Regions:
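Cys/His-rich Zn2+-binding cysteine-cluster or related metal-binding knuckle/ribbon modules and their
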Residues: 1-6, 11, 15, 25-90
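Long C-terminal interaction/binding lobes of large macromolecular proteins
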Residues: 2, 99, 127-199
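Signal for well-folded cores of large energy- and translation-related assemblies
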Residues: 14, 32, 47, 60, ...
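Conserved phosphate/pyrophosphate-binding and hydrolysis machinery centered on Walker-type P-loop NTPases
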Residues: 17, 36, 49, 61, ...
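Extended interfacial segments that mediate partner engagement and assembly in macromolecular machines
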Residues: 24, 72-142
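Core recognition of P-loop NTPase motor domains used across DNA-transaction enzymes
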Residues: 38, 43-48, 57, 69-70, ...
């Protein structure tokens, strides 16, 4: 329909998560209207991130070198490991300024339907970190989905088999601040009730 380079750009943009054909077209035309400097700046940023960013050799978070900034930070408490599914999950936890431990990024969650088994995740590496390190607590912060819950239980069981004195905790889940009870689904409300605490 369009010139081949435009069609190719639309096709490539539509491969991004959450970007459909129409949004890809709008983005492609935005790039065409942008200055050459801005368009080439975007292309260079994409190339640079693919060339320079890899995974931390310790926690598997995104890193520009062998280790990520968090693993290199001597002020972090290495006795506490927070387990997350993806590198993007580290960001909201860091924004709270409440957590000073280190992380372990699994690279996904268990999902037999999608063909994601324990061997496809960084679970063996997590168990090795706990076994070989001075870890006192593992905070499992996988998403509150069926896959996230299955992953959390699998990890908890794998860590119990180590027979070490390691506390395995799960992030509390429940109602967000300002939520109305009438709009809460049964699972969320049930978890909020189960996780209630004294005032």
């Amino acid at each position: 329909m369009y010139a081949a380079p435009v069609d190719r750009l639309i096709t490539e943009l539509s491969k991004l998560p959450g970007i459909g054909q129409r949004t890809a077209q709008r983005l492609a035309f935005h790039v065409l209207r942008a200055s050459e400097q801005d368009a080439l700046g975007l292309a260079e940023a994409i190339r640079e991130v693919k060339e320079r960013i890899g995974l931390c050799e310790v926690c598997f978070n995104l890193s520009e070198g062998p280790r990520c900034r968090i693993c290199e930070d001597e002020r972090r408490d290495r006795s506490v490991i927070c387990v997350v599914e993806e590198p993007a999950d580290v960001i909201p936890i860091e924004r709270t300024h409440e957590y000073r431990g280190v992380y372990h990024v699994l690279g996904g969650a268990l999902s037999p339907i999608d063909g994601i088994d324990p061997e496809d995740l960084k679970i063996v590496e997590l168990v090795a970190r706990v076994r070989d390190g001075d870890v006192g607590e593992v905070v499992i912060a996988t998403n509150p989905t069926t896959s996230g819950e299955a992953t959390a239980f699998y990890i908890a069981e794998a860590l119990r088999e180590l027979e070490r004195d390691v506390s395995v905790t799960r992030l509390a889940s429940g109602l967000p601040m300002g939520a109305d009870l009438e709009y809460a689904d049964e699972i969320t409300l049930g978890k909020a009730l189960a996780g209630r605490r004294a005032l």
